Amino acid sequence: MIGNWNYGTGRRKSAVARVFIKAGKGDIIVNGKPIADYFSRETSLMIVRQPLELTNHGQTFDIKVNVNGGGETGQAGAVRHGITRALIDYDATLKPSLSSAGFVTRDAREVERKKVGLRKARRAKQFSKR
């Protein structure tokens, strides 16, 4: 705990989010912007708010987030993971409910690298029989 802030780091794909939460009125600031201005997709906003809604803390915390790397979906997943870890730092009794919802586990899926001799990671050149 840093002062009266609770901290959590979240990661998803190549995105990393540093999340700070403290008691407040429910403001979420991402990279200096309100969350609705930062994330344009409604699904991204929903993903970020999932752990707060699950624990009924939607309007009880002010959240500051620094996130970099990746795209919008990866950043939203990283912020969700960071908020989850910060909530656990705030109150460890929330961990079972967050864990059963699958928010504590880091999504380890990464982009598969392109292989030599193939067009993409798995896509080969079109095969011609004749």
From Swiss-Prot:
Single GO MF annotation: structural constituent of ribosome
Keywords per UniProt: Ribonucleoprotein, Ribosomal protein
Name the record gives this protein: Small ribosomal subunit protein uS9
Organism the protein comes from: Burkholderia cenocepacia (strain HI2424)
GO BP field: translation
Domain of life: Bacteria
Signal peptide: none
Similarity comment: Belongs to the universal ribosomal protein uS9 family.
Cellular component aspect of the GO annotation: cytosolic small ribosomal subunit
InterPro entries associated with the record: Ribosomal_Su5_D2-typ_SF (IPR020568), Ribosomal_uS9 (IPR000754), Ribosomal_uS9_bac/plastid (IPR023035), Ribosomal_uS9_CS (IPR020574), Ribsml_uS5_D2-typ_fold_subgr (IPR014721)
